[in-house]
Amino acid sequence: MLDNVLRIATRQSPLALWQAHYVKDKLMASHPGLVVELVPMVTRGDVILDTPLAKVGGKGLFVKELEVALLENRADIAVHSMKDVPVEFPQGLGLVTICKREDPRDAFVSNTYDSLDALPAGSIVGTSSLRRQCQLAERRPDLIIRSLRGNVGTRLSKLDNGEYDAIILAVAGLKRLGLESRIRAALPPEISLPAVGQGAVGIECRLDDARTRELLAALNHHETALRVTAERAMNTRLEGGCQVPIGSYAELIDGEIWLRALVGAPDGSQIIRGERRGAPQDAEQMGISLAEELLNNGAREILAEVYNGDAPA
């Protein structure tokens, strides 16, 4: 491969391609003369569209094929939505850069109603996320929550066709696709705690590829990386995959990390919450200790049920 060429493995959804082009533009701005090529591919998560993600099982539904391309040297980097990135990486690969975070909140989207609380009893709300489901069901047990799969455009079409009264999407994805006008309300973390890494774009590469790591260094956003480190440390201890009823959100306020997390029963009957505040250098340990607290307070039993009896130790 030529020294001035960098290949990006990416999914082919409009949002994934936006993220890949975002990284491409940042790289070319930082390194004039660099030629950046996209290597689009299809992942298992893109193909299995008729089953709720939680039932598909497995981790890395949206990243495995990209990682194989890295290992086989068909690409140099893979660009991911951080909320899709598993807690473990194949040997030789790792997350080396996290770009500046977009708005991490969930979005309430409806053609008829202005807010979650304005929905009449019995309204049908679409989401494929157990994390969103459990928080919705806790706040509004009178709603009917149905699975919703597909890319952002597909989900909006299903709403527009009348299959749902409202759907929940990520604010970041809608903003990136120029669809911010579809957001009726951004849900604060107190109502819908975001997913681990939500709104952040991560870049994975071969750990022994010094040239690529050097090119990527300029794209790393230190504050976002600290926040996502705390969130992912918590998720790692909980052995969380992409599709589990786990929420985690870290903010950096006055030089201190404030980490909030929850584990919920998908039907909203029980949600275990906790939080930590501490120094940025302790981000990883904070995440681990908060996870331990959640496990001891009942999260272990909830996760055992979700994982079919295989709970975190």
Curated annotation (Swiss-Prot):
Transmembrane segments: none
Pfam families: Porphobil_deam, Porphobil_deamC
EC number: 2.5.1.61
GO annotation (BP), single: protoporphyrinogen IX biosynthetic process
GO cellular component: cytoplasm
Pathways per UniProt: Porphyrin-containing compound metabolism; protoporphyrin-IX biosynthesis; coproporphyrinogen-III from 5-aminolevulinate: step 2/4
Keyword Transferase recorded: yes
Catalyzed chemical reaction(s): 4 porphobilinogen + H2O = hydroxymethylbilane + 4 NH4(+)
UniProt similarity note: Belongs to the HMBS family.
Subunit text: Monomer.
Further details from the record: The porphobilinogen subunits are added to the dipyrromethane group.
Protein name listed in UniProt: Porphobilinogen deaminase
Lineage: Bacteria, Pseudomonadati, Pseudomonadota, Gammaproteobacteria, Enterobacterales
